[in-house]
């Protein structure tokens, strides 16, 4: 049975609040579907939990939204506040509750990921954590993307590492192995254990343990030299020189350079804060990490503490420095220090420097945080101006948060595809992009129909919503209820505006499709014609009067161009696949199954063409006679 929110069940709420113990511990807030919304900790559970429901208590919009959904609260009592902190950290890490995401770093700054769960792990740059891959290890988030890419490129030149997600060939190594960039993991030319040992050395660079790595490599170089393995010794020497080059431009030195320190400072404006972490190891700046935070209902000390809890709960204990310099005194300075010391198994000091060089570095980190804050605010303000202007152009009731744009791509009807791109708050949200293969039997080579294609795509896109409405659902009421109901019904993708790449004809076909779905009164739909950049709205013959350089039009063009790029990329990919298959279809005796086997094994027509008879005949499921036919087709002059 689904529980109703506590805030609407005064009797149950009153009974629950009376029985809360005033001990240290954690509280887990859940919605009516038993989904975890929020995990919190407190020295006194009763006082903290009651504060959420106390009348007259001003909560931030984010927390107010959460409280309206809370239907059950689970309590876990601990012996002390330190245990509560550790438990909270573990619960957040395990469950990733929606309302615990105070820090907004996922899409702004990249991480370095090492896939330790693989037999031969990869190392790559990413902006998104893979939730299901628990053995993945992440380093970051790094502020300087250019420097991170450069560092990763240099590391892959210094150490032979796996270069590809999918092997280029199934039965042989590629060029990367020949030039020493890869140890031949696809053919298991190196054992998994030896490869992981190499990667552990690379990991030490991102952990800031370059001094340890240098000592390790120097010992190995001497060992190789004494064993007269001069080529191996030279390779290790080159790695040592390369590591030195990675940091040779780093001149920032702080007192007691033998000590490892992280310096953390922040800058705030309105409801957003930028937090920067400078990682100093052996007197050198080896990393600059960044977070953004919603600071409504939080002061500077709370935000800094939240950053520290979040960041250090996700790193290896060896990466925790012996000293952390912070801009403001933390809410629970001693508690956090003891917690980190317990994880590291070594004393960790958290200090607020007031004078000397350390205080100057805090100011420098604060300055960098402020620069990053202004950069983000400037981008946000620009997007807001564009969205506001677009709202005025189209006479919309509200600023469109989610905008979708659709485009069709084909060549005279062949390989017809469509794209759906999504902008949220004026920014491309690539995780929501979709591609469609046009399925209508009327669309074929020599016969194109953009109107029918667009109608098909829109019908497929909004079919779920039409079914919901047909079953008696109220779309407007559903959208106004910002609860977990949308996610539960898999109806969390309603756009505030739909943009069609095309003119009046394409717009009319889309409106007709929406009328058939009975959604024409719910959706805002427009079209943008390429030739004169004209904007059309339903049931109006003339285009809207606009200026080409006004902010709203710039946003529409950027959206349309992105939809076109995404559609044409998919079209080229599909056409390339068809052309590969069509060439192989000309070879006598090759059916669809064998064509599929060939392409899976060799990856390209060029590779099949270059393959020897031995390579062809050893392809699983092919056989010698078929290999002869393929070889003769591509090399008729060598036919004996």
UniProtKB/Swiss-Prot annotation:
Q: Name one GO molecular function term.
A: DNA binding
Q: Which GO terms describe its biological process?
A: nucleotide-excision repair; SOS response
Where does the UniProt entry say this protein principally localizes?
A: cytoplasm
What the entry lists under Pfam families is as follows: GIY-YIG, HHH_2, UvrC_RNaseH, UvrC_RNaseH_dom
Where does the UniProt annotation locate this protein? Cytoplasm
Q: Which Gene3D superfamilies does the annotation name? A: 5' to 3' exonuclease, C-terminal subdomain, GIY-YIG endonuclease, UvrC, RNAse H endonuclease domain
Q: Any keyword Cytoplasm? A: yes
Work out whether the entry's keyword set contains DNA repair: yes
Question: Sorted alphabetically, which InterPro entries does this protein's record hold?
Answer: DisA/LigA_HHH (IPR041663), GIY-YIG_endonuc (IPR000305), GIY-YIG_endonuc_sf (IPR035901), GIY-YIG_UvrC_Cho (IPR047296), Hlx-hairpin-Hlx_DNA-bd_motif (IPR003583), RuvA_2-like (IPR010994), UVR_dom (IPR001943), UVR_dom_sf (IPR036876)
Ranges for the GIY-YIG domain? 22-101
The GO cellular component terms are: cytoplasm; excinuclease repair complex
Keywords for this protein: Cytoplasm, DNA damage, DNA excision, DNA repair, Excision nuclease, SOS response
- Name the PANTHER family for this protein: UVRABC SYSTEM PROTEIN C, UVRC/OXIDOREDUCTASE
Task: Please explain the role this protein plays, according to its UniProt record.
Answer: The UvrABC repair system catalyzes the recognition and processing of DNA lesions. UvrC both incises the 5' and 3' sides of the lesion. The N-terminal half is responsible for the 3' incision and the C-terminal half is responsible for the 5' incision.
**What name goes with this protein?**
UvrABC system protein C
Which organism is the protein's source? Answer: Prochlorococcus marinus (strain NATL1A)
Gene for this chain: uvrC
């Amino acid at each position: 049975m689904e529980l109703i929110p506590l805030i609407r069940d005064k009797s149950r709420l009153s009974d629950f609040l009376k029985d809360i113990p005033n001990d240290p511990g954690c509280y887990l807030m859940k919605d009516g579907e038993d989904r975890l919304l929020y995990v919190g900790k407190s020295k006194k559970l009763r006082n903290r939990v009651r504060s959420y429901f106390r009348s007259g208590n001003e909560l931030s919009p984010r927390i107010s939204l959460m409280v309206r959904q809370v239907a059950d609260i689970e309590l876990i009592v601990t012996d002390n506040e330190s245990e509560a902190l550790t438990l909270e950290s573990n619960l957040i890490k395990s469950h990733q509750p929606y309302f615990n995401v105070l820090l907004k770093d996922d899409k702004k700054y990249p991480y370095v990921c090492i896939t330790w769960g693989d037999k031969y792990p990869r190392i790559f740059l990413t902006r998104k954590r893979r939730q299901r891959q628990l053995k993945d290890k992440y380093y970051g988030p790094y502020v300087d993307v250019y420097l991170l890419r450069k560092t990763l490129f240099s590391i892959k030149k210094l150490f032979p590492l796996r270069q590809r997600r999918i092997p280029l060939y199934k039965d042989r190594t590629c060029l990367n192995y020949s030039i020493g960039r890869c140890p031949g993991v696809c053919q298991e030319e190196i054992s998994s254990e030896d490869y992981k040992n190499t990667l552990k050395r690379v990991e030490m660079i991102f952990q800031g343990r370059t001094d340890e790595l240098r000592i390790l490599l120097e010992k190995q170089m001497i060992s190789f030299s004494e064993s007269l393995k001069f080529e191996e010794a030279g390779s290790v020497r080159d790695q040592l020189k390369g590591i030195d080059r990675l940091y040779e431009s780093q001149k920032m030195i702080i007192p007691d350079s033998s000590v490892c320190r992280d310096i953390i400072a922040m800058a705030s404006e309105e409801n957003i804060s930028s937090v920067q972490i400078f990682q100093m190891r052996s007197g050198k700046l080896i990393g600059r990490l960044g977070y953004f935070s919603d600071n409504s209902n939080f002061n500077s000390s709370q935000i800094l503490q939240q950053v520290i809890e979040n960041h250090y709960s996700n790193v290896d204990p060896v990466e925790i420095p012996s000293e952390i310099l912070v801009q403001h005194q933390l809410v629970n300075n001693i508690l956090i220090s003891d917690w980190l010391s317990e994880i590291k198994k070594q004393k960790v000091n958290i200090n607020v420097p007031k004078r000397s060089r350390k205080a100057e570095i805090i100011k420098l980190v604060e300055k960098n945080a402020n620069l990053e804050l202004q950069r983000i605010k400037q981008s946000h303000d620009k997007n807001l101006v564009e969205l506001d202007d677009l709202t005025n152009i189209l006479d919309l009731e509200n600023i469109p948060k989610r905008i979708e744009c659709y485009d069709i791509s084909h060549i005279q009807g062949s390989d017809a595809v469509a794209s759906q791109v999504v902008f949220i708050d004026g920014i491309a949200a690539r995780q929501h992009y979709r591609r469609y293969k046009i399925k209508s039997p009327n669309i074929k080579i020599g016969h194109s129909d953009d109107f029918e294609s667009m109608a098909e795509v829109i019908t497929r896109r909004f079919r779920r919503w039409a079914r919901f409405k047909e079953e008696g659902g109220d779309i407007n009421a559903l959208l106004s209820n910002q609860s977990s109901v949308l996610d539960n019904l898999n109806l969390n993708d309603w756009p505030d505006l739909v943009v069609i790449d095309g003119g009046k004809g394409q717009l009319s076909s889309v409106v007709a499709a929406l009328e058939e779905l009975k959604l024409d009164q719910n959706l805002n739909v427009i079209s943008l014609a390429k030739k004169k950049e004209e904007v059309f709205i339903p049931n109006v013959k003339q285009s809207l009067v606009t200026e080409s350089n006004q902010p709203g039009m710039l946003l529409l063009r950027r959206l349309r161009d992105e939809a076109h790029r995404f559609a044409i990329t998919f079209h080229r990919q599909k056409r390339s696949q068809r052309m590969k298959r069509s060439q192989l279809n000309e070879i006598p005796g090759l059916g669809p199954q064998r064509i599929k086997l060939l392409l899976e094994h060799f990856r390209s027509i060029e590779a099949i063409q270059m393959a020897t008879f031995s390579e062809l005949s050893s392809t699983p499921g092919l056989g010698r006679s078929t290999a002869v036919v393929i070889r003769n087709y591509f090399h008729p002059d060598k036919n004996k």
